[in-house]
Amino acid sequence: MDFLDIAGKNFLVFGVANKKSIAFAVGEVLSEAEAKVVYSVRSAARKESVSKFLPDADIFLCDVEREYEIKELAENISKKYPKIHGIVHSIAFANYEGGLKPFHETRKKDFLQSVDISCYSLVAIANAFKDLLDKKASVVTISISATKMAAEPYGFMAPVKAALDSTICFLAKSFSSFSEIRFNSVNPGLLKTSASAGIPGYLDYYLFAEQLTLRKKALTTKEVANTVAFLLSERASGINAQRIAIDCGMSVNYFDKDIITKATRV
């Protein structure tokens, strides 16, 4: 028996954009374990592009900014899948048009739109799918490791992700009144994804983060996906309302002697 024991179970994955997406890597790991993976993307154009590299996948449409579409998605999926055993929420958006600005110059509409798409969407999805989820299902969202640091390349996305981390605690508590459904976040360090490529100056931070890892090798999306798959399985039944950091030890290595030498020697 496969360790994860998820063969034949149904999982809904939000947020796949291309082969560099965390959502894509999660789908691969779940499929390798013989689970059924269902995808949700935000537009017909995205569905068309995703279908090119996932030709046999069952792909649904849902723009999470429109709450009625989330409800329609649950209804449409329920017609084909009587139970969903897990949901992966890999959705985030921040409008960096015009480049990164000092945090205090963040526009209200940009901040609130980011909260709506990146954070509130999880609440709306959980509510819409509560009757379709198996009573021991698992919901995993993708956050970031740097919500407590003023990491400039993330801009206002960091406090939005901090709100997301808090949200899982309240969802876990709320759902505990009628189920054993678990909510957790996976909080990776810096990754090479298409989304991160759009962040001004991100590459320099990514290369610096790689030097800070204990192994001196950057984190991969496959490593993040493996952790997500574990949390989705009942092997992780004791883990609920938790923030799981995956950063290859970066967060304990800020005083690495090689980094210090480079910074203090001219």
Residue ranges of model-derived segments:
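Canonical Rossmann dinucleotide-binding motif of NAD(H)/NADP(H)-dependent dehydrogenases/reductases
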Residues: 3-40
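Catalytic loop of short-chain dehydrogenase/reductase
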Residues: 15-24, 92-131, 135-178, 187-192, ...
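Conserved mid-core segment of classical short-chain dehydrogenase/reductases
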Residues: 62, 66-71, 75, 79-80, ...
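Short, small/polar-rich loop/turn modules that mediate ligand/substrate recognition or access, typified
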Residues: 177-182, 239-241
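Conserved SDR Rossmann-fold cofactor-binding beta-strand/turn motif
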Residues: 182-192, 232, 245-247
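A short C-terminal helix-loop "cap" of Rossmann-like NAD(P)-dependent dehydrogenase/epimerase domains
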Residues: 199-213, 262-265
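A conserved structural motif in NAD(P)-dependent oxidoreductases
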Residues: 213-224
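Short C-terminal tail/terminal secondary-structure segment
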Residues: 240-266
